[in-house]
C-alpha cells in the first residue's frame, strides 16, 4: 500500500479501467486487449498490436514506486519486536507471497483480457465483486492518506521548531494536530480540487528518491552515532507514552536475533502494508514494451526483490541504531537539530504532502463511479467528496495515537485482501475448469493462499483488538 500506490489507477484511460464496448466483452478470450472485427484484408488485432512503449527498466521503476510507501518508516519497529533473523525471514515470506499473488493476477488478466483490478472483481463475482474490490482499494488508500498526514503531524513541528530554534512542544502553532489542518486546507485541498492530476503524477519518482535518501541517511547515522540507547542525546525522546524511559525495552546495545512480545503481531501487517502494489500491476503491464506474462512477472520479481533489499537494510540499520527504543515512525527518533536528518525530513514531508492528493483522486473516482455512475461531472459533488474525505482523514489522524495503529489496521484488512484473498478468488473463479480443473494443484495452491490470507487477517486483528482492550497498545507503544 506505497506512497504512489494509487497513482496508476487515476492515470488510466477508460479502457484501462475496463470501460469497454459491449462487444469487447465477447472478444476477451482472443487476447489480453479486446479487438473489434477486422476490416477485410486485415489480420485480427493481437496483444502485440497494442504494445506499450515503456522499457523493462522503467517498468521496474514504476512498480517500485507503487510498492514504496510510508510503511518503510515502521519496519525497524517491527524488527525490534521480532528480532533480526525472524524479521528478515518474515519479510522474505511476504515478498515471495506478493510475487505469487501477482502471478495469479497476470494469469487471470491473460484469460479474460481485463486490465483493471476492479474489473477482475466484476468478472469473478459480478457487480458485487466490483463494489467489494473498489471498497477495499478505497480503504487502503484512506489508510495510506492517514499515514502520510500522520508523518506531517509528527515531523512538521520538528522542522518548524528547528528553523525557529524553539521547543516543538512549546507554542500553539507548533502543535501537530493544528499543522495538519493548515496543510490540508492551504496545500492539499487546492491540489485535490483539480480535475486532472497533471504534473502531480510525477511525485511517484520523488517519493522513491526521498526514501532512497532516507535509507542512505539511516545507514550513515548508524555509523556516526554508534549506540544511542540510554545515554546518547541524539535520539529524540518518545512523547507518546510518558511512562516509558528513553531506553525503552532494552537497556543495552545488544541486538536480538529472535524475540517475541505482544507487539510482534503488528510486524506482519506492517510488512504487508509495505508491499501492496497490486492495483497498479495491470496498468504497468499494459504499458510494458514487448508485453508477455513472463516479462511482466520478471518486472514484478525485480521490483519486489529491490524493495526487499531496501526494506531489509532500512530496518536493520534503524534497529541497530536505536534497538528496542525505536518508534513506529523511525524518523521521529532522530534529533531535530541534526542537519542531515532535517534535509531528510523536508524531503519526506514534500513527498507525502504532494502524494496525498494523488491518492485522493482514485478514491473520489471510485466513489463517483459507485454512487453516481450515470451522472455528468459536477463541481459541487467534486468539491464535496474531496472535503468529506479530507475531514474524515484529518479526524482519524488526530484521534489515532500512533502511526503503528494505522499500519496495523490497514495491514490487517485491506493489505491481505489485495495481496492474498482477492487474487486467489479471481483465480478460482476466472480460470476455466477446462484449463485448470478445480482439484488441480494450481487451484489448490490458490485456495490455500486465500485461506492463509483470511487466517492472517483474523489473527492479526484479534491480537490488535486484544491489545487495545487490555491497554497494552499504550503501555508498550511508541
UniProtKB/Swiss-Prot annotation:
Pfam families documented for this protein: Aa_trans
Modulation of this protein's activity: Not inhibited by lithium. Partial allosteric regulation on ions sodium binding.
Side Extracellular, residues: 81-93, 153-172, 220-263, 323-340, 404-405, 467-478
Compartment list: Cell membrane
GO molecular function: glycine transmembrane transporter activity; L-glutamine transmembrane transporter activity; L-glutamine, sodium:proton antiporter activity; neutral amino acid, sodium:proton antiporter activity
Cellular component GO terms held in the UniProt record: plasma membrane
Residues in compartment: Cytoplasmic: 1-57, 115-131, 194-198, 285-301, 362-382, 427-445
Keyword annotations of the record: Cell membrane, Disulfide bond, Glycoprotein, Membrane, Transmembrane, Transmembrane helix
Any one Gene Ontology BP term: glycine transport
Catalysis performed (reactions): L-serine(out) + Na(+)(out) + H(+)(in) = L-serine(in) + Na(+)(in) + H(+)(out); L-alanine(out) + Na(+)(out) + H(+)(in) = L-alanine(in) + Na(+)(in) + H(+)(out); glycine(out) + Na(+)(out) + H(+)(in) = glycine(in) + Na(+)(in) + H(+)(out); L-glutamine(out) + Na(+)(out) + H(+)(in) = L-glutamine(in) + Na(+)(in) + H(+)(out)
Annotated site location: Involved in pH-sensing to the transport activity regulation: 470
Region (Disordered): 1-20
SS bond partners: 227-253
InterPro entries: AA_transpt_TM
Glycosylation sites: 232
Transmembrane segment boundaries: 58-80, 94-114, 132-152, 173-193, 199-219, 264-284, 302-322, 341-361, 383-403, 406-426, 446-466
Predominant place of localization: membrane
Membrane-protein topology: Multi-pass membrane protein
Described function: Symporter that cotransports neutral amino acids and sodium ions, coupled to an H(+) antiporter activity. Releases L-glutamine and glycine from astroglial cells and may participate in the glutamate/GABA-glutamine cycle and the NMDA receptors activation. In addition contributes significantly to L-glutamine uptake in retina, namely in ganglion and Mueller cells and, therefore participates in the retinal glutamate-glutamine cycle. The transport activity is pH sensitive, Li(+) tolerant, bidirectional and associated with large uncoupled fluxes of protons.
Similarity-based family: Belongs to the amino acid/polyamine transporter 2 family.
PANTHER family per the UniProt record, alphabetical: AMINO ACID TRANSPORTER (PTHR22950), SODIUM-COUPLED NEUTRAL AMINO ACID TRANSPORTER 5 (PTHR22950:SF74)
Protein name (Swiss-Prot/TrEMBL): Sodium-coupled neutral amino acid transporter 5
Annotated organism of origin: Bos taurus
Gene name tied to this protein: SLC38A5
Amino acid at each position: 500500500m506505497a506512497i504512489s500506490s494509487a497513482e496508476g489507477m487515476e492515470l488510466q484511460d477508460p479502457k484501462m479501467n475496463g470501460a469497454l464496448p459491449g462487444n469487447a466483452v465477447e472478444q476477451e478470450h482472443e487476447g489480453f486487449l479486446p479487438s473489434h472485427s477486422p476490416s477485410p484484408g486485415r489480420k485480427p488485432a493481437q496483444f502485440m498490436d497494442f504494445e506499450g512503449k515503456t522499457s523493462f527498466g522503467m517498468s521496474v521503476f514504476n512498480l517500485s514506486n507503487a510498492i514504496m510507501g510510508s510503511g518503510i518508516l515502521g519496519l525497524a519497529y517491527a524488527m525490534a519486536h521480532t528480532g533480526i533473523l525472524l524479521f528478515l525471514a518474515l519479510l522474505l515470506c511476504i515478498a515471495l507471497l506478493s510475487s505469487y499473488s501477482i502471478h495469479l493476477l497476470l494469469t487471470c488478466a491473460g484469460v479474460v483480457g481485463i486490465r483493471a483490478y476492479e474489473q477482475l472483481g466484476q468478472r469473478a463475482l459480478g457487480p458485487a465483486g466490483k463494489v467489494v474490490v473498489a471498497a477495499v482499494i478505497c480503504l487502503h488508500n484512506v489508510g495510506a492518506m492517514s499515514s502520510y498526514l500522520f508523518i506531517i503531524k509528527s515531523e512538521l513541528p520538528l522542522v518548524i521548531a528547528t528553523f525557529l530554534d524553539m521547543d516543538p512542544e512549546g507554542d500553539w502553532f507548533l502543535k501537530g494536530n493544528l499543522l495538519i489542518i493548515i496543510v490540508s486546507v492551504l496545500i492539499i485541498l487546492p491540489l485535490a480540487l483539480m480535475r486532472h492530476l497533471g504534473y502531480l503524477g510525477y511525485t511517484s519518482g520523488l517519493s522513491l528518491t526521498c526514501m532512497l535518501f532516507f535509507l542512505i541517511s539511516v545507514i550513515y547515522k548508524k555509523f556516526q552515532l554508534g549506540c544511542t540507547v540510554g545515554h546518547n542525546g541524539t535520539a529524540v525522546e518518545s512523547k507518546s507514552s510518558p511512562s516509558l524511559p528513553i531506553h525503552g525495552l532494552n537497556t543495552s546495545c545488544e541486538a536480538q536475533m529472535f524475540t517475541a512480545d505482544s507487539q510482534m503481531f503488528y510486524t506482519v501487517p506492517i510488512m504487508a502494508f509495505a508491499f501492496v502494489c497490486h492495483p497498479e500491476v495491470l496498468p504497468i503491464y499494459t504499458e510494458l514494451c514487448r508485453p508477455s506474462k513472463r516479462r511482466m512477472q520478471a518486472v514484478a520479481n525485480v521490483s519486489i526483490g529491490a524493495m526487499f533489499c531496501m526494506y531489509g537494510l532500512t530496518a536493520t540499520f534503524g534497529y541497530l541504531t536505536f534497538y528496542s527504543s525505536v518508534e513506529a515512525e523511525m524518523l521521529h527518533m532522530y534529533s531535530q537539530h541534526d542537519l542531515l536528518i532535517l534535509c531528510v525530513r523536508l524531503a519526506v514531508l514534500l513527498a507525502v504532502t504532494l502524494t496525498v492528493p494523488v491518492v485522493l483522486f482514485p478514491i473520489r473516482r471510485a466513489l463517483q463511479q459507485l454512487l453516481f455512475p450515470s451522472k455528468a461531472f459536477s463541481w459541487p459533488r467534486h468539491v464535496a467528496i474531496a472535503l468529506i474525505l479530507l475531514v474524515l482523514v484529518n479526524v482519524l489522524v488526530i484521534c489515532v495515537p500512533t502511526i503503528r495503529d494505522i499500519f496495523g489496521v490497514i495491514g490487517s484488512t485491506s493489505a491481505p485482501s489485495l495481496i492474498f484473498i482477492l487474487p486467489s478468488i479471481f483465480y478460482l473463479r476466472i480460470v476455466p475448469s477446462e484449463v485448470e480443473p478445480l482439484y488441480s494443484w494450481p487451484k489448490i495452491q490458490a485456495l490455500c493462499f486465500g485461506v492463509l490470507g483470511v487466517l492472517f487477517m483474523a489473527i492479526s486483528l484479534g491480537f490488535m483488538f486484544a491489545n487495545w482492550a487490555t491497554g497494552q497498545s499504550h503501555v508498550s507503544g511508541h
